[in-house]
A protein has these predicted regions:
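Bacterial N-terminal signal peptides that target proteins for export
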Residues: 1-9
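Bacterial N-terminal signal peptides
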Residues: 9-18
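Cysteine-nucleophile amide-bond enzymes
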Residues: 22-399
């Protein structure tokens, strides 16, 4: 019994917009002209002086409001320039409940800018720009001698880290997001963040159909529908007999993936995918070593073999050309991250390993990039698990 998920393998199968003072690719409010007038009183003044400043509201040329305020932590003091937003708040009184709109200025809203300074000596630590509805994606700058360095963080992983900008750190006191993009266009993969909501109709439609049918499916170990529409055991092909009155479709996790794939290929090919080719082994183990010895008796890569083979099969149907796994190029091998954030600070992860896959810590970041760069594509995944024993056994299991 495998207790802990360790890595995962993926195979390829096939905000609101705002009126801005300076246009940027993300359509977020621009505070650059406001910030240019705050340098002496907010950005370079001593902590004691900044504490004397009260929160202030400014408007840019487009009429958008921003709040400038100070927030402190144990080790830093932070100056926020944050755009105006409204949120619904439920108010409870003796006469019942009503909802009112409240003005807010979130520090991590799209268009928000923050300067973080050291509390001991007042020196700047970093400047951060938020430009998406999800604040776990941001770009930041740190001072370095007479210039500055750039990081792009996507859900806790660095797409770039410590890239020289060639401009002084103080430039970002007043730089707009559009200017940031111009300064970093040759070093920062902005294409990872490009999103066109009109390109996802087919994926949303497919997800809606699957979600609608989920209540009629129940988990059953090793169960699948074969090419002859029979319910069989995935590994052996033996028929599975159901109790009378069974109304729901019993499927294993692999059987569910095949059910999805069959829904894609049957309208094109006129039949479901064959079971046996999906079991072809794609991983070779050395005869020596604990894993190698076990592989001679057990399938340690069943789920990985399966998703590779079924992805190749779907590709074959869609292109009209028969591809074996090693010819299909269906493995996702993108390595877009140079480092990651953890509770212990910055780590340097190996994001991809052949026949082992991705560390699970990069999945959210990876999916974000893939969703933006390859709209309309879906992915089948295999989870590699461990028994946490010594010697350790790691398998792509069929659950």
């Amino acid at each position: 019994f495998m207790k802990r998920k360790s890595t995962i393998w993926f195979v390829l199968f096939l905000f609101p917009m705002f009126l801005t003072a300076e246009n940027n690719a993300f359509g977020v409010p621009d505070s650059s002209e406001i910030r240019s007038g705050l340098i002496e009183t907010w950005f370079e003044a001593s902590l004691m002086t900044v504490r004397e400043n009260i929160p202030e509201i400014y408007s840019n040329k487009a009429g958008q409001e921003f709040q400038v305020r100070l927030e402190e932590t144990d080790s830093s003091f932070n100056v926020f320039v944050s755009p105006h937003m409204t949120m619904n708040v439920d108010v409870y009184t003796e006469n019942g409940k009503y909802t009112k709109k409240q003005d807010v200025y979130p520090g991590d809203a799209p268009g928000s800018w923050v300067l973080i300074r050291n509390k001991k000596d007042g020196k700047p630590i970093r400047i951060r720009y938020y430009f998406l509805s999800n604040s776990e994606v941001y770009i930041q700058f740190t001072p370095y001698n007479k210039t500055s360095l750039c990081d792009l963080v996507i859900f806790g992983n660095y797409a770039v880290k410590g890239i020289p900008t060639g401009v002084p750190f103080s430039r970002f006191y007043s730089a707009s997001l559009a200017e940031v993009q111009r300064i970093t266009k040759s070093n920062v993969p902005w294409n990872y963040l490009e999103y066109d909501p009109t390109l996802y109709h087919s994926v949303h439609q497919m997800a809606g159909v699957i979600r609608e049918r989920l209540p009629n499916i129940v988990y059953h170990k090793d169960a699948m529908i074969d090419e002859n529409d029979n319910l069989v055991e995935f590994g052996s092909g033996r028929p599975i007999k159901l109790e009378e009155g069974t109304e729901k479709l019993p499927l294993s996790s692999s059987g569910f993936i095949k059910w999805v794939a069959d829904g894609l290929v049957e309208p094109v090919a006129g039949s479901k995918l064959k079971r046996l080719p999906l079991l072809t082994q794609t991983v070779e183990y050395k005869d020596i070593g604990y894993q190698g010895v076990l592989s001679q008796e057990y399938s340690l890569s069943f789920a990985l073999d399966f998703v590779r083979n079924i992805s190749s099969a779907v590709l074959s149907v869609n292109t009209g050309t028969v591809y074996r796994f090693n010819e299909s190029g269906v493995d996702v091998t993108l390595e877009p991250f140079v480092a990651g954030l953890s509770e212990n600070g910055i780590v340097n992860p190996v994001t991809f390993s052949n026949d082992s896959g991705y560390n699970i810590n990069v999945l959210k970041s990876l999916f974000y990039i893939l969703a933006n760069s390859e709209p309309g594509v879906i992915y089948f995944g295999a989870i590699r698990q461990t028994d946490n024993k010594t010697p350790e056994v790691k398998v792509f299991n069929n659950n």
